[in-house]
């Protein structure tokens, strides 16, 4: 497939690149493990997310909520030992919590329904008074330890209450009560905290958003952001441990997000309220095999070029494969949500986030966006990302206006031939538990192919030609060449003499 693009350097595309705003994680308690922290450090060193959002801040494994009997009375105390240990480490790594308030401590729960391998209680509180007290005490203690910056940590009430497994019977009215109680308790403590919801996913999402805003309007609640999730596959076929899904149309899924923006804006009271996509990916299961592929990265390249159009925040689910919703993973590559596999092996998806972060650092002045490319311009030159989510290679020719001079073009390429750790793992026998040597071998082929060239511009423009292989992504930068050769050194003679 062939394609030609001509860039107008004076053109400006309304492109909002918030790729590094937030990233997802498995439950909070996993942050007490060594492998988890190694993966998070690896991600932060290359990409550097601002916030991290995960489940289970009130789950029993963090041991925050305690009821005990004394002198014939039921008394209450809180324990923040593990939570502070986790957040201290987060802050050392350079990331802050996005506070999803979930799930229910077993002593506070009204029922016994649980979810996941780790038994998250997904029932309402037995007393909302005790829930509110716990939430406010949490915020007070966070503020006492970490200062006024805590006021800027976003808060989300629960997770996916429209799904019966995540909230008892998927009871809309009961969730609205939870939101109202929580919102009013937090705002009564300090109105500057930013509180959002309803954190829905997939099922009856339009009805939930409409009814949620109608409820908020009725009770004069003004959520600081509207939260929802965004996944882009059809219902999976499950074989053994694994889920196989077909991707939905990327433009259709972007249109679905725009429909949420449009719906929110039909309410005068909430017009312009920021929308946070607090989870997004392709597959919504932690055994979705597409997550480990090059296609996953190429599909997300297109999504990332549009997610900022209608959403202030979009948080990829998740940064790493330390994750236990369906139990402990059975193998190195298992369709895990993470952009990094065990042993700090970056998957292709890791690199599309890295590329968008580099693009953001290069410039926010977007001069072109289409189905296969996004290009920005700065005083230094140009940078761009190319992708091909189709099943045949794409030969692309880009004409760029640029002043006469010499330039260096650097390309970083990730595709099924040059950066495909999944294939190497498969080729050596799909070891479930790779040895140290095998892990290093797999990791060695998990990095982009870097190439370079010199562009000599003499007529005010240059033409960049690239072949983006199927399911491939490419990042490029074009900057002026600063040539400072030493006396007597001739590169052309070096490479031709021998």
Predicted regions and their residues:
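Carbohydrate-binding surface patches
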Residues: 370-427, 470-477, 482-485
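Glycoside hydrolase catalytic-domain groove-lining segments
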Residues: 39, 233-288, 312-321
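Short, acidic/polar
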Residues: 9, 30-44, 141, 206-216, ...
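Mature N-terminal, pre-catalytic/accessory segment of carbohydrate-active enzymes
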Residues: 1-48, 470, 480-498
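Aromatic/acidic polysaccharide-binding cleft in carbohydrate-active enzymes
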Residues: 277-397
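C-terminal beta-strand-rich structural cap/linker in extracellular carbohydrate-active enzymes
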Residues: 432-498
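Substrate-binding clefts and catalytic carboxylate motifs of secreted carbohydrate-active enzymes
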Residues: 287-325, 378, 404-450
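Substrate-binding cleft and catalytic face of glycoside hydrolase catalytic domains
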Residues: 47-248
């Amino acid at each position: 497939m062939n394609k030609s693009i001509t860039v107008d350097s004076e053109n400006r595309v309304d492109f909002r690149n918030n790729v590094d705003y937030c990233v997802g994680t498995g439950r909070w308690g996993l942050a007490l493990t060594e492998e988890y922290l190694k993966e998070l450090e690896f991600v932060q060193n290359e990409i550097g997310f601002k916030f991290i959002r995960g489940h289970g801040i009130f789950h029993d494994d963090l041991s925050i909520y305690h009821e005990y009997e004394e002198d014939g009375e039921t008394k209450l105390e809180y324990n923040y030992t593990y939570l502070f240990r986790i957040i201290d480490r987060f802050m050392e790594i350079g990331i802050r919590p996005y506070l999803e308030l979930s799930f229910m401590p077993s002593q506070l729960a009204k029922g016994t329904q649980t979810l996941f391998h780790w038994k998250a209680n997904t029932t309402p509180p037995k007393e909302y008074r005790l829930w509110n007290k716990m939430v406010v005490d949490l915020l007070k203690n966070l503020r006492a330890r970490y200062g006024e910056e805590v006021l800027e940590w976003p808060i989300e009430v629960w997770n996916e209450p429209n799904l019966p497994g995540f909230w008892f019977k998927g009871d809309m009215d009961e969730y609205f009560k939870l939101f109202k109680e929580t919102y009013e308790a937090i705002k009564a403590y300090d109105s500057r905290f930013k509180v959002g919801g309803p954190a829905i996913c997939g099922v009856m999402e339009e009805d939930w958003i409409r009814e949620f805003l109608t409820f908020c309007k009725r009770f004069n609640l003004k959520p600081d952001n509207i939260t929802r999730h965004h996944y882009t596959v059809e219902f999976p076929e499950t074989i053994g441990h694994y889920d196989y899904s077909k991707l939905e149309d990327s433009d259709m899924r972007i249109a679905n997000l725009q429909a949420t923006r449009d719906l929110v804006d039909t309410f005068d009271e909430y017009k312009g309220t920021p929308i946070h996509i607090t989870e997004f990916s392709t597959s919504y299961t932690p055994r979705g095999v597409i997550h480990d592929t090059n296609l996953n990265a190429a599909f997300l390249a297109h999504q990332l070029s549009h997610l900022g159009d209608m959403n202030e925040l979009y948080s990829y689910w998740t940064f790493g494969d330390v994750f236990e919703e369906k139990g402990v993973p059975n193998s190195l590559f298992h369709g895990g949500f993470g952009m990094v596999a065990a042993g700090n092996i970056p998957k292709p998806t890791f690199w599309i986030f890295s590329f968008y972060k580099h693009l953001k650092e290069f410039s926010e002045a977007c001069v072109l966006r289409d189905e296969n490319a996004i290009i920005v311009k700065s005083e230094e030159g140009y940078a761009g990302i190319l992708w091909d989510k189709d099943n045949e290679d794409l030969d692309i020719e880009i004409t760029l206006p640029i002043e006469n001079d010499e330039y260096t073009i650097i390309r970083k390429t990730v595709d099924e031939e040059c950066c495909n750790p999944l294939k190497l793992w498969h080729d050596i026998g799909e070891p479930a538990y790779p040895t140290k040597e095998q892990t290093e071998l797999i990791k060695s082929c998990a990095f982009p192919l870097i190439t370079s060239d010199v562009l000599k511009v003499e007529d005010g423009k240059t033409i960049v030609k690239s072949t983006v292989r199927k399911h491939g992504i490419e990042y490029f930068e074009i900057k002026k060449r600063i040539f400072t050769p030493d006396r007597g050194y001739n590169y052309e003679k070096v490479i031709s003499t021998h």
